[in-house]
């Protein structure tokens, strides 16, 4: 039942944001609020559990990419920059603001994860520099540029939202950040 509760809560968050009620959740599950409160003493505790499950899923994706021996270090960075944000698609700016406003402790947990999440990417970028797979750039600046780009994608007012899938946009962002905008011949001439 616990997994069903978390899955339905996640669905309701996507549908209604964090304004869903425990009544909404009980009705969607065909159970009573009493049953819900047997598993979670409050909506805050339930939201915290959803955030923790979400973080665990993102860490598993990251671990799978990091441990994939068929990928070189540069491919691992690219995969992380494309795959992880797709998993975080639920977290648009509106939902993050709601989470911060109504479930502050859960927001703190998620915020800490989002900030620390870049440690592995930074380590991989530094490894790429050492292996001369990328130019001598500032990895922190690269990550901030990337975060700024993906924040635009998750903005509800993002103008290209309906023209491209999130995956297509993320792949384009990573392509531009890794390869720039000049054609190979032009890059060779400069």
UniProtKB/Swiss-Prot annotation:
MF-aspect GO terms: DNA-binding transcription factor activity; transcription cis-regulatory region binding
Domain HTH tetR-type: from-to ranges: 1-58
Keyword Transmembrane helix in annotation: no
Cited SUPFAM superfamilies: Homeodomain-like (SSF46689), Tetracyclin repressor-like, C-terminal domain (SSF48498)
GO annotation terms (biological process): regulation of DNA-templated transcription
Keywords in alphabetical order: DNA-binding, Repressor, Transcription, Transcription regulation
Alphabetized InterPro entries for the sequence: Homeodomain-like_sf (IPR009057), HTH-type_TetR-like_transc_reg (IPR050109), HTH_TetR (IPR001647), Tet_transcr_reg_TetR-rel_C_sf (IPR036271)
DNA-binding region location: 21-40
PANTHER family: HTH-TYPE TRANSCRIPTIONAL REGULATOR RUTR (PTHR30055), HTH-TYPE TRANSCRIPTIONAL REPRESSOR KSTR2 (PTHR30055:SF175)
Identification of the protein by name: Uncharacterized HTH-type transcriptional regulator YvaF
Organism of this sequence: Bacillus subtilis (strain 168)
């Amino acid at each position: 039942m616990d997994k069903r509760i978390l899955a339905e809560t996640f669905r309701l968050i996507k549908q209604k944001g964090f304004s869903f009620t425990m009544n909404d959740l009980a009705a969607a599950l065909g159970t009573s609020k009493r049953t819900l409160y047997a598993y979670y003493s409050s909506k805050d505790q339930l939201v915290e559990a959803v955030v923790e499950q979400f973080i665990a899923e993102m860490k598993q994706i990251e671990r799978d990419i990091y441990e994939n021996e068929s990928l070189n270090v540069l491919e691992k960075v690219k995969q992380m920059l494309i795959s992880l944000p797709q998993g975080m698609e639920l977290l648009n700016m509106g939902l993050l603001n709601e989470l911060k406003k109504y479930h502050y402790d859960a927001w703190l947990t998620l915020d800490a994860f989002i900030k620390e999440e870049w440690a592995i990417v930074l380590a991989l970028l530094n490894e790429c520099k050492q292996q001369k797979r990328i130019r001598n750039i500032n990895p922190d600046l690269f990550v901030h540029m990337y975060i700024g780009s993906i924040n635009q994608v998750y903005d509800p007012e993002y103008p290209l939202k309906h023209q491209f899938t999130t995956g297509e946009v993320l792949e384009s962002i990573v392509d531009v950040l890794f390869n720039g905008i000049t054609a190979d011949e032009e890059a060779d001439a400069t």
